[in-house]
Amino acid sequence: MISNISKKILSNSSKFIQQQSYSTKRIKVTGPVVEMDGDEQTRIMWESIKSKLIFPYVDITPEYYDLGLPNRDATNDQVTIDAANAIKRAKIGVKCATITPDEARVKEFGLKEMWKSPNGTIRNILDGTVFRGPIICKNLPLLVPGWKKPIIIGRHAHGDQYKATDFVVNGPGKLEMIFTPSQGEPIKKVIYDFKGSGVAMGMYNTTSSITAFAHSCFQYAIDKKYPLYLSTKNTILKKYDGQFKDIFQEIYEREYSTKFGELGIWYEHRLIDDMVAFALKSEGGFVWACKNYDGDVQSDIVAQGYGSLGLMTSVLTNADGVFASEASHGTVTRHFREHQKGNETSTNSVASIFAWTSALGQRGKLDNNKDLVKFAQDMEKACVESIESGFMTKDLAICIKGNQVKRSNYLNTEEYINKVAEFYNKIK
């Protein structure tokens, strides 16, 4: 059920779009797309992207949800739940970056409480996997020069250390783990006999979540036509990580090996240390399935290896074919403060543009709308070609010029979006 507040927001968004005067040659979108608005500088860019790069070319009325922090607070975060359920129904969503409040934000916005991460809420409701991959521009230097193709990290963002129970052991004693089944005898394991103080932790995962993760990874690899690697430390965690390894292998052999063979791609399990070394020596061009902690760490390492967090895509998918995209960076608070002062900003909008094109491209694939798929591809090409032609925001100019960057070397926020529109109109 959609809350009354969300219905009102959706209605207002539809009226706004319908009031605009656009070309009659726009590409018609018949399938639903859920749009989730966000916060601060990314919210400002979001409106500009829609008005200059999306709505002039695409005839679409998104199902709109305002996930800006003030509205999440006003709805007691119900709007986030409504948005997640809407994505589940529509299959396609596109999200602007949002604030996850800490104590300082609670005070700044006068919040009722410290609301949870909207990404986490959406991910849990959809039981999805987050895939992060780079947008590669030939003229931007790479920290890992050999990475010529994308490395896409698929993170199993469920359980493990992130749902663990940990505590400090203050003195000697026996640490035990007990599982009490609903039927049958309890299972008791002695973990350690402490002679003094220390620390302890217990964590878990579920077969259903690992299975859904495996399906998402295999399906995403097929969509990208890239080989898939799963990394674990099953030589040490023989039961825990062994479960990941066994589930992936069983599902691959039963459901995906034939399709992988037809595409000339493959699946392979590797130890995490071996996989890290392989990734650094490779040229890229694969999907890397990681457990929760590994994915958290490796996704940031990979992002920096390609040169810029501003050129990273983020897609949430699940085994049911749900697809929700967003930029992998935050709300760019520092730039927003400058914007509030009336100062010029040069904020990189590429990842936010790709959030829209990824969602619309996937909608086009589901609806067999070839014009929409081509629009998405051409708009992405316009983003890359503009950068490769020397038109970019300050963060990317610094990657090339370093401390020698001058104002003439980069465009401001709106100038870059305008330049992308200019390049798109040449390409289409």
Swiss-Prot record:
Gene3D superfamilies: Isopropylmalate Dehydrogenase. Pfam families: Iso_dh (PF00180). One of its GO terms (biological process) is tricarboxylic acid cycle. Its EC number is 1.1.1.42. Binds 1 Mg(2+) or Mn(2+) ion per subunit. SMART domains: Iso_dh (SM01329). Substrate binds at T100, S117, P118, N119, G120, T121, I122, R123, R132, R155. It catalyses: D-threo-isocitrate + NADP(+) = 2-oxoglutarate + CO2 + NADPH. GO terms for cellular component: mitochondrion. The record marks Y162, K233 as: Critical for catalysis. Its cofactor is Mg(2+); Mn(2+). Mn(2+) binds at D273, D296. GO terms for molecular function: isocitrate dehydrogenase (NADP+) activity; magnesium ion binding; NAD binding. InterPro entries: IsoCit/isopropylmalate_DH_CS, Isocitrate_DH_NADP, IsoPropMal-DH-like_dom. SUPFAM superfamilies: Isocitrate/Isopropylmalate dehydrogenase-like (SSF53659). NADP(+) binds at T98, I99, T100, R105, K281, G330, T331, V332, T333, R334, H335, N348. Residues 1-27 form a transit peptide. Homodimer. Belongs to the isocitrate and isopropylmalate dehydrogenases family. This is Isocitrate dehydrogenase [NADP], mitochondrial. It comes from Dictyostelium discoideum.
